[in-house]
């Protein structure tokens, strides 16, 4: 990560990317359309967003990173799924859609963004799970990524 990119801007990019990936999984809408909705503000009322999720409405977002994560996950979702599959104890189609989006996002970062330490990837996924997924999803996400990390990324 370059010195000019702040961690908060990356965190915001991940949050937007997670929600956009989740939206794509549900709708299968064109990535450019989903990206535009998130970046133009059409997806959310900004004041409402500030009240419910202040971090998402923060003025700092690494937009280039958001775009990379969204397009990268969508374009390589089948490959990412094949890397995730060995570490989940149930069929992929039985995963909660938010858990799947989280795992895809984290696996993309682990396999394609070696400039981001794997511990940061796992921690960010856990924090996102605590906010956006079911109550104990962060434990599941942590377990899967912890098992996968040594096999997909050199520590």
Swiss-Prot record:
InterPro entries: NusB-like_sf, NusB_fam, NusB_RsmB_TIM44. GO terms for biological process: DNA-templated transcription termination; transcription antitermination. Keywords: RNA-binding, Transcription, Transcription antitermination, Transcription regulation. The keyword Cell membrane does not apply. The keyword RNA-binding applies. GO terms for molecular function: RNA binding. One of its GO terms (cellular component) is cytosol. Involved in transcription antitermination. Required for transcription of ribosomal RNA (rRNA) genes. Binds specifically to the boxA antiterminator sequence of the ribosomal RNA (rrn) operons. Belongs to the NusB family. This is Transcription antitermination protein NusB. It comes from Vibrio parahaemolyticus serotype O3:K6 (strain RIMD 2210633). The lineage of its organism: Bacteria, Pseudomonadati, Pseudomonadota, Gammaproteobacteria, Vibrionales.
């Amino acid at each position: 990560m370059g010195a000019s990119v702040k961690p908060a801007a990356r965190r915001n990019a991940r949050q937007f990317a997670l929600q956009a990936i989740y939206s794509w999984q549900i709708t299968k809408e064109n990535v450019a359309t989903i990206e535009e909705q998130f970046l133009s503000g059409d997806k959310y009322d900004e004041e409402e967003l500030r009240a419910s999720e202040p971090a998402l409405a923060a003025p700092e977002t690494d937009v280039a990173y958001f775009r990379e994560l969204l397009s990268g996950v969508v374009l390589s979702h089948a490959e990412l799924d094949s890397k995730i599959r060995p570490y989940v104890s149930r069929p992929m189609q039985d995963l909660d859609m938010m858990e799947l989006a989280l795992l895809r996002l984290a696996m993309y970062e682990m396999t394609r963004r070696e400039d981001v330490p794997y511990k940061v990837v796992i921690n960010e996924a856990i924090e996102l799970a605590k906010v956006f997924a079911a109550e104990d999803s962060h434990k599941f996400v942590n377990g899967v990524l912890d098992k996968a990390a040594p096999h997909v990324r050199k520590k």
